[in-house]
């Protein structure tokens, strides 16, 4: 069947291949790069390959060979090995699905592929460096930093949060019927933990994570200053491309340097900070196991676990509270259990 719209072609490919939501998203990224690189629609690229096949074009003159090789050369200059291999594999799978015979493609020579340096614990931003970054960041970037440090959310998942996420996730504390009054309450308190129900972008699976008290209080104060009371407005204003630019600019200004070819102060490193410090951040107090951190990051359980074990947000919150001092920049936390409820006790460092 011939299609004139890329989306129809792609939908047919995914439907008949039985791809998961995560696979569909990763294919979308590769298809967009392939189309943009060749400045052609996917329909036209496929039609070109089919025409050559029907015309029995000699293998050494096939355009599809040049297209795949030139695209791979582009990826080699801009990406690391696994990304290159996975991207080319997806393009070849797409052609194969549409019954296009692909000529022999020489294997990738690993000597010419960039390799990221392995990131060690010492490469992570320290708490002192993060406090310094907070001094120089504007209000919007401060919120981004604290949200990712405390929740471990990816940029996309953090960006998906709205003011309603904060309002509803702290309702058990403020018990207000409007966001303005809730913010006034939250701005005064230093012991409120926000429960966030998010969707993991890679898998479309819901999961729970949390914002620690210093993050909640700082956001509340900024929102009050900005008079930002629309519940459906984004919690974090910068778009993803701009926030990357802001992090890079601040990283370079503070001289934090790079590791693995990337700035040390960047969202993904803050996620690593969250994971590492929750599991290994202290010789004192409580730490979380890797399985618990995986739950807080939305990383999936296997299918059997997923079928039988459901996440209890109150239990996850209790586990998080016990360990959240490890990812806090300004305060340390203890807790009491009063009448079956966990009460957080906040103390300055």
Question: Language-model segments: which ranges?
Answer:
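N-terminal core-binding DNA-recognition domain of tyrosine recombinases/integrases
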Residues: 8-118
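DNA breakage-rejoining catalytic core of tyrosine-based enzymes
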Residues: 113-131, 192, 202-214, 228-231
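Basic, Lys/Arg- and aromatic-enriched nucleic-acid-binding interface segment
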Residues: 127-156
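A short, basic/aromatic helix-end/turn motif that makes direct DNA contacts
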Residues: 160-170, 281-302, 307-314
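Conserved tyrosine-mediated DNA breakage-rejoining catalytic core shared by Y-recombinases
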Residues: 161-218
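C-terminal catalytic core of Y-nucleophile DNA break-rejoin enzymes
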Residues: 195, 200-221, 229-251, 266
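Short, basic (Lys/Arg/His-rich) helix/loop patches that form interaction surfaces
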Residues: 227-233, 245-302
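C-terminal secondary-structure termini that scaffold catalytic or DNA-interacting sites
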Residues: 315-349
């Amino acid at each position: 069947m011939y299609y004139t719209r890329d989306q129809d072609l792609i939908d047919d490919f995914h439907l008949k291949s039985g791809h998961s939501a995560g696979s569909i998203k990763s294919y979308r990224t590769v298809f967009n790069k392939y189309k943009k690189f060749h400045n052609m629609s996917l329909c036209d690229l496929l039609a070109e390959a089919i025409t050559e096949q029907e015309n029995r074009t000699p293998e050494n003159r096939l355009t599809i060979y040049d297209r795949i090789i030139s695209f791979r050369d582009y990826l080699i200059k801009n990406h690391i090995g696994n990304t290159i291999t996975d991207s080319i594999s997806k393009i070849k799978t797409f052609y194969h699905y549409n019954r296009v015979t692909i000529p022999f493609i020489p294997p990738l020579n690993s000597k010419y592929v960039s390799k990221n340096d392995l990131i060690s614990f010492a490469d992570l931003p320290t708490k002192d460096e993060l406090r310094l970054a907070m001094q120089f960041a504007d209000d919007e970037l401060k919120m981004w930093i604290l949200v990712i440090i405390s929740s471990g959310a990816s940029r996309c998942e953090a960006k998906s949060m709205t003011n309603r996420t904060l309002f509803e996730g702290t309702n058990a504390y403020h018990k207000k019927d409007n966001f303005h009054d809730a913010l006034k309450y939250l701005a005064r308190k230093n012991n409120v933990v926000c429960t966030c129900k998010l969707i993991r972008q890679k898998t479309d699976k819901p999961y729970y994570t949390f914002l620690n008290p210093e993050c909640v209080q700082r956001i509340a104060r900024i929102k009050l200053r900005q008079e930002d009371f629309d519940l459906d407005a984004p919690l974090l204003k910068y778009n993803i491309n701009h926030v990357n630019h802001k992090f890079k600019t601040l990283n370079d200004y503070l001289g934090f340097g790079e590791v693995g070819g990337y700035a040390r102060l960047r969202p993904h490193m803050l996620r690593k900070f969250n994971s590492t410090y929750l599991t290994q951040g202290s010789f004192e107090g409580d730490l979380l196991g890797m399985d618990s951190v995986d739950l807080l990051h939305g990383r999936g359980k296997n299918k059997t676990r997923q079928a039988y074990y459901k996440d209890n947000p109150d239990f996850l919150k209790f586990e998080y509270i016990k360990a959240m001092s490890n990812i806090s920049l300004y305060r340390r936390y203890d807790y009491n259990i009063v009448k079956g409820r966990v009460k957080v006790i906040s103390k300055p460092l």
